[in-house]
Amino acid sequence: MRILAVIPARAGSKRLPGKNTRLLAGKPLIAHTIVAALQSSCCEEIVVSTDSKQIADVAVQYGASVPWLRSEDLATDTSDVIHTVIDLLFKFQQMDVFFDSVLLLQPTSPFRKPETIRHAVEIHKVTGKSVVSVSPISLKPSWCRSIDSQGNLVKPELFQDLEIYCNENPIYKLNGSIYIATAKQIIENKSFYSEPTKPLLLNSISESIDIDTPIDWALTEKLMELNQEALV
C-alpha cells in the first residue's frame, strides 16, 4: 500500500503565531511530527503542505518534502484541510504519481509516537476503512446548563437524554492527531470519514495534546520539565 503522509502547516496562526517553527525540546514543533512519520516507516512520501518558505525550509531540513507551496486560497483562516489534501493528490496524479491512501498528521500533536502511527495504518490496512484518532472524554451532562432568553440558568431535556446515553455508552472526542483514509474515499466524499469509520483510541493524555494556544504550549513544556513524557 502506497501511503502519502500529509503534514499541514499554514503560516498564519493567530492564537499562537509562528508555532510550527517554534522550538520545543530544541527542535521546531513541526520537526517532531516529521521525525515520528519517518520512524514509523509506513509512508511512501512525507509531504509538508505550507504557504511559508520558512516552514518549507525547516521541513526539508528534517526529512520531509515540499514539492509545492500551498496557494493563497488554500491558506486562509477558513480553508478546510481536506481541500489541501485533494489538491496535493491531483498534483501528484498530474505527474503520474498515485497513492492508495493518505495519512494526515497535524504538527500540533508533538507527542504522537511512531508505533501509534503504525497502529493506525494497520487498522486501515486490515479493515479498509478510514481511521480517526479519538480520546476518552469525561462528560457529565448533569453538570451542564444553558441560559434561556430571560437570562436564567436552565437544564434542557436534551441534557437529560444525553445523561442517560452517557451512562450507557463511553464518549470520545476527536483529538486531531491522526487521520487515514483511501485516496478514492477522500476525493469522492471530500472527507476522511468513511461509513463506518474506525477509531484509534489514544488513552495517553500527552499523545492527545493539540497545541493551539499559549496555554497549550506552556502545558506541553511543563510535561517535559516533569520528565513525564519524552518527545521523538
From Swiss-Prot:
PANTHER family listed in its UniProt record: HAD SUPERFAMILY MEMBERS CMAS AND KDSC, N-ACYLNEURAMINATE CYTIDYLYLTRANSFERASE-RELATED
Species of provenance: Legionella pneumophila subsp. pneumophila (strain Philadelphia 1 / ATCC 33152 / DSM 7513)
Taxonomic superkingdom: Bacteria
Protein keywords: Nucleotidyltransferase, Transferase
This protein's name: CMP-N,N'-diacetyllegionaminic acid synthase
Transmembrane segments: none
Swiss-Prot/TrEMBL catalytic activity: N,N-diacetyllegionaminate + CTP = CMP-N,N-diacetyllegionaminate + diphosphate
A Gene Ontology biological process term: lipopolysaccharide biosynthetic process
